Amino acid sequence: HGRVIYIQHDDLPGGELEPGTPGWQLHPALQPAKGDSRVRKTACDSFLETELAFLLAEQSVDRLILCGSNTDFCVDTTVRSAAAHGFEVLVLQDGHTTADRPHLSAEQIIEHHNWMWRHLHLPEGRRITLLTTDQLLEAAQPALAC
């Protein structure tokens, strides 16, 4: 598999995502494995004032597969920033989530962002690719010849 980089948001003291608090902890099923990295950020953009770009350049990464929490904030901002940094961006359309907002349900927000990313035009004819998790796993299976 490819390298996994866990991006974790750090809030100010007293915030929901204050480092060390229960809300900040990664889900037990999402613990980094040996060789994975963790990047901590304080803004929606995972590239802004973090070591993410350096880690990716160090490994000669040119394609990112993105998933995560807060579709309408951190995920959207990072998708756009990754594209602006010239990466080939693939988003797991069933691999990002958010909460209901006063004006839209979480489901509507996710549907809107999947549509928007699919139709976002980038320089040089590049596009953001959206796949389901099943499609990604199917594409990653080695071909068998008998």
Residue ranges: model-predicted function:
Residues 8-10, 69-70:
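Short, well-ordered beta-to-alpha junction loops that form the rim of enzyme active sites
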Residues 15-146:
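Active-site-adjacent betaalpha module
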